[in-house]
Amino acid sequence: MKHLLFCIIALLLPTVTTAENRTYKLEVKSLQVVVNQDWLSPAVMRLKGDDVLNIGFDELSHDYHRYVYRLERCEADWTTSEELFESDWLEGFNHNVIDNYEHSINTTVPYTHYKLQIPNDRCRLKLSGNYRLHISEDGSDEDIATVEFMVTEQSMTLSVNVSSNTDIDTNQSHQQVSFGVKYGNHIMTDPQDQIQTVVMQNAREDTWRRNVRPSYISQNGLEWQHKKELIFDGGNEYRKFEILDPSHPTLGIEHVSWDGKNYQAQPYISEPRMNYLYDEDANGAFYIRNSDNRENDIISDYVWVNYRLKAPQFIEGHIVIDGHWATEHPDTYLMNYDASQDLYTASILQKLGYYSYQYLWMKEDGSTHPLPSEGNFYETENRYQILVYFKGTGERTWRLTAYSQTIIN
């Protein structure tokens, strides 16, 4: 029965987990995807510029694995770009070895850190749009990880506004997005067929609002005003903790102990938050580092983080832990109810660093909602991302022509 439950969760959770990045091997941990050094933002890079996509991950051993990567060009809906030749979007080679790796040093959990960059001297992207990068062992067809990122050409102009004065309520529990796009030099014959849009909150897949019909169509652009489909729950600020040294508890950590094999970190019990209190957070982002902030990739150790949430037991659905670092098998982030303590608990192996996270209530249909005990407030500082895709007359693919990120505060 437990195996069946995990299978059901695995089917539902991909629509819940924030990151489009996935790991499929138990020993692969701490998948990081960052453009330049901006760890707070989604992986969106400019087509013509100096942006660099940095990808890194750990394999929990000192054994060498010959990992390779290949790129896949995708359409606006993340299906493969079947009508394009590889040479249309890629300059160079599309089956490359990850030859940059280092073993961990003096860690209780041994691991090997692998990393790569896009573009590099072997491959460079020629076209804007969506991309999926597959990582596997050389000679194997099975991915050990996949990474999704976007390349924007910024050839259209976006204007965005987020307000707590919504078409549902005013200054209560919701936030509403309004935005407009200017075509620029693009020739537009049928805007509703040639434009696709995505709006999301904190880069969470389960908040994506795709192709909402515009309110106004003009010769120069489109506008989305007073659209109920663009109203979002305010939610609450993400919770956070930071573990920089397993021998000393730091931000959000009650204590750290050694069980003879691993370090065990106990964040403070997550108590109900019925009133809003501003607390600067990272909206699900994470940053690997240690107390010396040096050689973070190979000196930072792993600890078991034991989450505890004070909440009544839910009869329907499940409670999951959510953050951009949550890339492993879905049941890793499923919380179990401990009736003896009246707590939901979960234990996750994580690398030293700063982590931003939230608890979500996942219903049986896979939809996610703020926990009643976490609160739902219009003041919450959320980040909204807007993407605009364009497909010109006679063109074979959707290009990402505009991207913007706006913070409500």
Task: Describe these PLM feature segments.
Residues 113-121, 218-231, 343-350:
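Exposed aromatic-hydrophobic patches
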Residues 108-138:
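Ligand-binding face of N-terminal immunoglobulin V-set domains in extracellular IgSF glycoproteins
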Residues 26-75, 170-181, 292-307:
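Contiguous beta-strand segments within globular domains
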